[in-house]
Amino acid sequence: MEQGMDYWLGQIQQKDVGKRLQVGPDLMEYLSDRQKSIDLEQDQTVLDRMVDGLATSWVNSSNYKVALLGMDILSALVTRLQDRFRSQIGTVLPSLMDRLGDAKDSVREQDQNLLIKIMEQASNPQYVWERMFSGFKHKNFRTREGVCLCLIATLNVYGAHSLTLSKIVPHICNLLGDPNSQVRDAAINCLVEIYRHVGERVRADLSKKGLPQSRLNVIFTKFDEVQKSGTMILSSADKNFDDEDSVDGNRPSSASSSASSKAPQAARRGVSLGTARRPGTSSAAPKPGGTAKEGAGGVDEEDFIRGFEDVPTVQIYSSRDLEESLNKIREILSDDKHDWEQRISALKKIRSLLLAGAAEYDTFFPQLRLLDGAFKLSAKDLRSQVVREACITLGHLSSVLGNKFDHGAEAIMPTVFNLVPNSAKIMATSGVVAIRLIIRQTHVPRLIPIITSNCTSKSVAVRRRCYEFLDLLLQEWQTHSLERHVSVLAETIKKGIHDADSEARIVARKCYWGFHSHFSKEAEQLFHTLESSYQKALQSHLKNSDSIVSLPQSDRSSSSSQESLNRPLSAKRSPTGSTVSRASTATSKSTPGSLQRSRSDIDVNAATCAKSKATSGASAAPFSSVAALPPGSYASLGRIRTRRQSSGSTTSTASTPADTRGRSRAKVVSQSQPGSRSSSPGKLLGSGYGGIASGPQRVPQMPSSEKRSKIPRSQGCSRETSPSRIGLDRFGISQPGRIPSAMRVLSSSTDLEAAVADALKKPVRRRYEPYGMYSDDDANSDASSACSERSYSSKNGGIPHYLRQTEDVAEVLNHCASSNWSERKEGLIGLQNLLKSQRTLSRVELKRLCEIFTRMFADPHSKRVFSMFLETLVDFVIIHKDDLQDWLFILLTQLLKKMGADLLGSVQAKVQKALDVTRDSFPFDQQFNILMRFIVDQTQTPNLKVKVAILKYIESLARQMDPTDFVNSSETRLAVSRIITWTTEPKSSDVRKAAQVVLISLFELNTPEFTMLLGALPKTFQDGATKLLHNHLKNSSNSSMGSPSNTIGRTPSRHSSSRASPLTSPTNCSHGGLSPSMLDYDTENLNSDEIYSSLRGVTEAIEKFSFRSQVDLNEPVRREGKKESELGSCDVGIASPASDLRGGTDMVEGGRMALDNKTSLLNTQPPRAFTGPRGREYNPYAYSDSINSYDKTALKEAVFDDDMDQLRDVPIDHSDLVADLLKELSNHNERVEERKGALCELLKITREDSLAVWEEHFKTILLLLLETLGDKDHAIRALALRVLREILRNQPARFKNYAELTIMKTLEAHKDSHKEVVRAAEEAASTLAGSIHPEQCIKVLCPIIQTADYPINLAAIKMQTKVIERISKESLHQILPDIIPGLLQGYDNTESSVRKASVFCLVAIYSVIGEELKPYLAQLTGGKMKLLNLYIKRAQTTNSNSSSSSDVSTHS
């Protein structure tokens, strides 16, 4: 069958939500049709995977539609399989239990119905419930509640006889003490339901459970109510509840049994979650615009205000008296063991003290800080009265102390937010009112992140309330209090506009306009990031709110003061404490809702003047800036922060009833918009969205009532000399939003004059433009042009712009460097705005930002911050690429490392984008050199993913590089050799293929140079690369003959190199795509005649370069009695003109190659002279088979001489034997004797030194030996160390890439409890010290000496002493600052052996550098110096080569 089980399994496992929704119904149809799904039960494994996929991926999906579909499919499976589905119950139950706590009622209901169906058709209720007990302890309170409700439904459908209730009741009793009230209520309802089915025996059983008497009284009261109501199911009283003989412990009567277990199918299906849900689920969510009280059981601000003063009167006699009172209060509130009434009295006493003037005492505020913990505990209390009093007290503190309550408000706010979704109305409303009071009275910017973070809560109730709080905050607070969190506010409002809940969206749109009144520029930017549908919703919100029809008649007088706007949601309070709805100033002379279109064929200024005089003062477009709206339209927008003295008449309009959501239902006539292009971006920018024509323009005759100033203004005779008081309103200039300069038109001389005046009068500009919220010069200018780009973005009342210019970048950088992730995110948003404004950073700012970005690469909040960081990084690189050359190494390497991390797909794409931008922004040769350095850096241990990323990056770089960018340096040679080893990476085929592609790309990039580079490598590396290139050339030549047009995608310039290629024509032929088969080695046909001719060029080019290696790094550079010239070897070689020009970079005097810094393994001798392509000296012995046999003598001399083939015979190939030995050694902790034998055999092979063995098996052998060091058998551990030591003696050069790992494992072996192992470890460490390059060895040892404990630090110091004996004076000088701290630390160690070893190491250092050690020992005490001098003298007397003896210090 084409669409069998395997096909549907694949469909289930795919992740795309859209496809899932499409394929779900088809799958259900497939399962219901027995003819189509005949193979459903044939393959149990596939069925298991199918059910598992449905349970984990579908039912647990974040998309509720997918979850519902997943449950439908499972239901179809239950129907089809019946009792055969029983084996799958354990798979699906965890997911179904999780979904019992889902936020959507439909999901919970369907989940419960599915569980009931499983109990009926696939198993029995008891079997399912025994596997659901964990649900009573689920971390999600909704799930715990849902399990209780499911139990009630089970009892109603199947009756009590189907369950062993005595096993379930203890779990329910535990939930009676649950911290969540909804769970406690559900648990009580469960017990009541059980009582209905079982009877009085439940009452007796609960009495034995040790429950608190108060709780028992509540439960028993409910039992009595049920009994009196006549809804008991059992007719006979007192069944045997504890009897285990029956299923549920009772023997139901036939009547009750038939009533429950024989219930018809329809009746059973009728019992759904809806009937068992708590009644207040939906009402828990507040209604926007409603009062806090929300009916019976709640509280509002009036209750709070009465509670402020409804406290006993106290007197404060002294500071000490106050302090003692507060200490007693703190003691009571901090211990929830105290009686709740005592705690309530303590909370009231705080208010009493406030009324008595406690805030006037100096000791009050320190004591108040100490009460933070007590307040949190009280706000979390399970007793609602305590919570209520705590919230009233917090509100009172905020009202009395104002901003001085900043610390307490910040500390307590998160706890109070937890009350908002509480089902107990008294608790929820208390929390809401407390938060409102704090927002009104305590304007602390640190509260904003707390509010905005809760706007993303999973609870709809919390989100709705949070947007209400945000709206209140935007109305109540001054702009300067909000400036720090502009970006966070904008982001939060954007999320609210997209919220899943319609009421939250309504309030969020209201928040937007409040935000717009503070930060118009940012609001406009936010508007343009929204989709058109959301933009229209904002516009319609503005239109609907442009009316006063919903205002109460009492608030429509023209003299209504601005205070009426300052209390949204709670409304104004009359002296008697009565509340009325929120009012609005009504000064508009326009007809409500008369928004009109602008006409582009009318002069802008003329239209503006006419509009200011017309009866209709509406804005010029369907969407215009708030400044242009008639004042009366502010009824539902953010408050206007100045008091206006209104003039003119108001339009009397009959009020309309409000709907259930508290919103006005005034009729707004839908007017057609002919040719409505006003929603297009250009139109919005040009005239609608804060455009030139929005609002009254330069009309000096404008009445004072039409002016808006955002700051409190002195009236009367005030001369307003303060610069901050100079507002735009004096000149009758509106404040249009910023628009692009390209879209501004100076349409008259008036505008031109204004522009000139603006340019002349604003402060001298700095060399940069500040970002975002600081781009507002006009806030402090005496005049502003109507077309000025900044004329509407002023923030009067904030810090003047000319004082902020130097702060903006510093503040952004400080945010970016913050330890708080939200501040870092805010800083990044600010930095994005700054970069988009083309603000150029100074060198100091760049340096600091680079340091911050370097730290951000390791940001733990990857989901929250890292994604935004990557976006900012791209902009940063594009703008400042010319100044980031020094930072390129960190940038490139960190991005490549991130490619190896486990990141989300979207984040990974951003990392890749950053890499692409980096590649295109910097010189290719510089990037290539950095990558070469990164590959050979011993401190880096890239994982397989990082290796793939590096290789792919090099490949893409090689496609764009110029041939002259490829430099045959020592670093490049070592990196290429490393890449060649990666072509045989055993763990990853991706790495192997990528490495092969890179080698081919480099070969094609600069064939002569790459060929010469290969000639400098050991023969084994050459063999690996040559095989690959042979295979590639063979495949490419074949593919080019078959399809001449097939290309590899390289740019044509790559083949137009001016250098002559020593290879034959196949190198220049076009190549096909690199398929995996082309990249594999084809050893069978390697020497066949048919490809020999095409490979001759490659072979000759490699063989005709003489081979030499640099001075081997395993022997000391400092050799006594040896001259530098003796270290040279064959100076035979040939190079191209490019390498000839570079010759000087790799030469030192005497024609000897310079040692590259710590990493160079292979250097070619520079050519003596260039004599043309064939003018090279040819040495046929240089490439004999034994060229790379690592002979001890050759290693000591540190050269690969031409006659090395004469030093030993060709070794025997033990590859097959070693493979068997390794297989045996992989049996860790098993077959001890066999593995001992294998290790002994391996020891013999090690001494025979077979080249082929080590080429093929070295890495595997090393890793197995290091793993064997953890074996259970001590003899095996000791033997492994001896084998390791023998390999170190014979193959030291191979440990270069594994030095750190080998040293660490060897030192760890010193901790072994068996002396035999420790002795072997000491021998291995001693050999290791003489085998690995000294500098590399010391760099590994220094941190170990400083951080490790005894005996590892002792072994490391001893090893370091041996290394120092073979290091040169110059090299030791460079790394001495790293060495000395660890030794001085060891000199103070509690272990005498460590102290002694440290002294010996210092003596060894002194023997190398002499008196120059003295400055490093300044912190040693006199006694320690004397001891050190004693050992130095003793060493000098025993050393005949020493010429003099001197003290290190003057202390002696």
Curated annotation (Swiss-Prot):
HEAT repeat placement: 68-87, 88-124, 163-200, 407-442, 443-479, 926-963, 1256-1293, 1374-1411
UniProt-listed SMART domains: TOG (SM01349)
Any coiled-coil regions, as ranges: none
Positions of region (Disordered): 239-299, 545-735, 771-792, 1033-1076
UniProt xrefs under InterPro entries: ARM-like, ARM-type_fold, CLASP_N_dom, HEAT_type_2, TOG
Pfam family, one: CLASP_N
GO terms under cellular component: centrosome; Golgi apparatus; kinetochore; microtubule; spindle
Keyword Cell division attributed: yes
A GO BP annotation: microtubule organizing center organization
Protein location: Cytoplasm, Cytoskeleton; Cytoplasm, Cytoskeleton, Microtubule organizing center, Centrosome; Chromosome, Centromere, Kinetochore; Cytoplasm, Cytoskeleton, Spindle
Polar residues composition-biased segments: 573-597, 715-724, 1058-1070
Compositional bias per record (Low complexity), positions renumbered to this chain: 253-267, 550-569, 606-621, 645-659, 668-682, 781-792, 1034-1046
Keywords, alphabetical: Cell cycle, Cell division, Centromere, Chromosome, Cytoplasm, Cytoskeleton, Golgi apparatus, Kinetochore, Microtubule, Mitosis, Repeat
Main location: cytoplasm
Function noted in UniProt: Microtubule plus-end tracking protein that promotes the stabilization of dynamic microtubules during anaphase. Plays a crucial role in chromatin-induced microtubule formation. May also act at microtubule minus ends. May be involved in the nucleation of noncentrosomal microtubules originating from the trans-Golgi network (TGN).
Assembly behavior: Interacts (via C-terminus) with clip1/clip-170, and cenpe.
UniProt record similarity statement: Belongs to the CLASP family.
Protein name per UniProt: CLIP-associating protein 1
Biological source species: Xenopus tropicalis (Western clawed frog)
